[in-house]
Amino acid sequence: DQPRSRGLGDVYKRQNYGCFHSINTFDMADANTHFYELQDVPHGQVHICKYISAVNQHIKECYVYTPPGYDRHRDRNYPVLYLQHGVGENETGWVWQGRMQFIMDNLLYAGKCREMLVVMCSGYAFEPEEDPVFFPGDFDKELTESVIPFIEQEFRCIHNRWGRAVAGLSLGSAQATLSAGKHPELFSALGVFSGVGLRLFREYPMGQYMQIFLSCGSYEEELHKEQERCQAMLLAKGNSCFQKTYEGFHEWKVWRESLHDFVQLLFQNEELLQDNTIYLKKKTYTSDIFCMQTMEESMLFFDPVYKMVRFDVDEQGNPAGRYIDMPRGIHMLDEHSVEFNLYAPGADKVEVDVFDCGKLELSRSVQHEGYWTGILGNLEKGFHYVTFDVNGIRVVNPDAPVGYGCFQTINYIEVPEKDFKYPLLRDIPHGHVRMDYYTSSQTGRQKLCYVYTPPGYETGDKSYPVLYLQHGGGENEIGWLRQGKIANMADDLLTQGLMDEMIIVMNTGYAFREDGTSHGALSSFGEELVMDCIPYIDTMYRTMADREHRAMAGLSMGGMQTQRTVFEHTDLFAWAGIFSGGLVIRDEEVDYCDILLNPDKFRETFHMLYVASVSYTHLTLPTKRIV
């Protein structure tokens, strides 16, 4: 939830993934930040999609930007830019640090670039037990054998080299250069932002019709000289090559500007985009590592790599560093025991608290210098938040799954449940999860919601019912997706025929008006949902827009919001789910006796009211008495 505008010098802090860790970042606004800010313009969507790597058979996620109107213009095919992050970052980098989606929205609104898809993947593709080389890695195989076939199967793409471009920053630029050089038949343009792989231009002759864009920061002086030499060499060979230098260092300020200028050059020849023959085929794989992946996925990294980079150069001065393994912050040893590791070299005392399971004081590790370690057994199955204290100060473990809970960035652990396997990742058809922005009438701010669409939504034309699914107090719109693993569950239930196809919308439940008139606990989210979110979803998606095909559910606070919203808007909802949220018949604020104590009125109002609770919450006994 971000302000629609901000002033010079304003600082905006975030939790992102960088340097191979969960890490804090901040932005300072200046006079030239408008091009990557969230503006009041039509927004494209960012899809979160799953595919299987041809390199290691892991299920991985990629983020795919589709331009405004993509779903409406179903007769159009779009060119694709494959865009890679730098070392230590991952598939989320260009979305959260790079603001790619806002750069594209603003350029498209101004008519300065062509409509295109932008695909962002994690560039780490390691074989099991591999001693991987840092530069340039083997993402090329995953890109050409897994990612491109997947994208061209799932999205309406132009299937020729003139409809594909590849780019990246730092390490990602080396990976992009390697793929463009090895496969000139696949790509027509290459973007090298703060490129570290310029020697690859000498090893791989770029196709004569390859459009090449080089950029760097003004303080990357040696890199600038190398890029100028590289540009001269490429121009002499007949390539189209641009070189631009931006004020700055090896940093996101430079890379945002690079992307902004690069995409304006792409896909300008309409005639060359007409051939649309599919010749890259998607492969299928099997794997037994999906359970581990399920336990480790989080909001900052879907398929984490526990590595760091040891930088080095060879005798010729070329990059020759290697990846080195790092301990997992939380490591399941067996179905009941977990090992905890935290890097805190200057600490005197380190403690871990697994909610509902107990605390543990860690000891200095003998194997890993600077680390503290310990094992906790007899853990209850299921999901638990985890906190780490160093010398009595709460910290986030950057090498463990991270979510948002208890109104803070927080670690968590998932202990597998043998009798409840629906959340596990599987090699089955996967739906997409999209990021959507709408404006709240209650706060005047832009709101982000996540929207699950079932497999086949992209290529079909049918309409779907909608479930609005809310998180609990202290959590936010990402909770059901990462902690709750709702996309995995929906995929599995659909595959087994245990669930009807539906769209699932996940929102942040906080909508407090600036004048202080919102409900103190539940905020004005109910009003926002009814006035803003539902109309937006019904406009943007193929929904069955009536009460018979609209449901709402939530856990804890979200369950309370569900009852309040659904009972006050029975013209909009015929289905409701209250999970550990209590069920109110009448209190000092509301009176639902007319519905709940009148069987005929109840049956007329609801197709189903599903109320669930567990045995040890303060909400259980009142709920059971009411039911």
Language-model segments: residues:
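Primarily recognizes the serine-hydrolase "nucleophile elbow" in alpha/beta-hydrolase
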Residues: N160-M206, D546-Y592
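N-terminal cap/lid segment of alpha/beta-hydrolase-fold proteins
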Residues: I23, M28-D71, E339, E414-E458
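The feature captures the conserved acid-bearing segment of alpha/beta-hydrolase catalytic domains
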Residues: V196-E251, V584-L619
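Single conserved hydrophobic/aromatic residue that forms the stacking wall/gate
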Residues: D1-L8, Y12, H618, T623-I626
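Aromatic-rich carbohydrate-binding modules that target alpha-glucans
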Residues: G9, K13-I23, A320, H331-L333, ...
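Short beta-strand element of the alpha/beta-hydrolase
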Residues: R76-G86, Y450, K462-G472
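C-terminal catalytic histidine-bearing segment of alpha/beta-hydrolase fold enzymes
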Residues: E220-T286, L619, R625-V627
